[in-house]
């Protein structure tokens, strides 16, 4: 549906709103891929026998809008709280990317490295697609 704007300010506001929605949607798509990679390259690689999974690691994958036009997908180390005081969220993030499960090295994937590869190959196209869905002509 075509819209008519009577000022540059109206046009800018409408375009900013379209961009904000597109960025939010792109972050959601990227977050889903990060969670898929965590499942396939971490959780599916090892079944613990000495501890019960809490899934805090999976749930620490998150997204947020930094500004109206900037979003990020990241692992929030502060969302993890393990019983061992030396095993912090930061330690878990590093260990998981090195295929370490509960202190045991297994043949697993490197979820973060895989996610970075995915983002480098796909994030721009995902954003362009989401901008087009908002009605913006993007090449």
What do the PLM-derived regions correspond to, one by one?
Residues 74-82:
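Secondary-structure transition/turn motif
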Residues 82-88, 92:
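A short, structured beta-strand/loop element
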Residues 1-74, 92-139:
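Short, Lys/Arg-rich flexible segments
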């Amino acid at each position: 549906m075509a819209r008519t704007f009577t000022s540059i300010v109206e046009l800018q506001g409408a375009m900013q709103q379209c961009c904000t929605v597109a960025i939010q949607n792109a972050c959601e798509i990227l977050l889903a891929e990060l969670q898929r990679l965590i499942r396939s390259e971490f959780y599916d690689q090892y079944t613990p026998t000495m501890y019960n999974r809490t899934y805090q690691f999976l749930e620490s994958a998150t997204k947020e809008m930094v500004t109206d036009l900037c979003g990020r997908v990241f692992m929030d180390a502060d969302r993890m709280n393990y019983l061992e005081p030396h095993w912090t969220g930061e330690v878990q993030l590093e260990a998981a990317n090195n295929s370490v499960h509960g202190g045991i090295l297994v043949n697993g994937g490197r979820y973060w490295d895989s996610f970075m590869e995915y983002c480098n190959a796909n994030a721009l196209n995902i954003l362009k697609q989401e901008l087009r869905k908002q009605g913006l002509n993007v090449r």
